Amino acid sequence: MKMSIFQLLMAAALGTGIVPTVTLAASPGDAADVQPRVDAARATAGAFLQQLGSTMKREMQAGGPAAAMKVCREVAPRAANDISLEKGWKVTRVGTRVRNPMLGTPDAWEQRVLLEFEQRAAQGEKFAEMTRVEVVEEPSGKSLRFMKAIGLAPQCVVCHGSPDQIPDSVRAELDAMYPHDRAVNYRPGDLRGAVSIKQPLDD
């Protein structure tokens, strides 16, 4: 069976222990066309995370963990949806362990990239600049896929840490809102998830 360029690169990477970040184009001439889309995705993901971080900090200072949970539960999905509608993309956050299966569950491609992010982090790469870009073919058409890693900040352990780090009041609210919650037992600096952007290319 003939291997794709990506499969060949991944096979070589596994042999060396280094997993590369690559941008794949359907043909050599596509690279120049794709790069502006990559730049736009990178800028959008960065602005999205900056907005959420600022809002989270403000709400945490004003109302504590309960107010911060509202940012993750309401503000982040609404902001992602607004960007998706504005740009005609699919913008979302996915997690290594999900709190809300309806919103944060990664698809097969996202699962693979999250695993790659963890491997790259184990080799010393920082989450702040960790991204993956790939042009993929799916039954629905060709799309540019972009992911930017999200590391767990120290202040996030009050909602995502070990049982002794999550206050009883927060745990009770999490249990009520997220009966299938698995997004706990993280430590600061762990990979929490990623911003995932999917841009259709067949338009």
Language model features with spans:
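Extracytoplasmic c-type cytochrome modules immediately beyond a signal peptide or single-pass transmembrane anchor
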Residues: 27-153, 165-203
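Signal peptide processing junction and immediate N-terminal pro/mature segment
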Residues: 20-28
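Bacterial N-terminal signal peptides
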Residues: 9-20
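Detector for the c-type heme attachment site
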Residues: 157-164
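Positively charged n-region of N-terminal signal peptides that target proteins for export
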Residues: 1-5
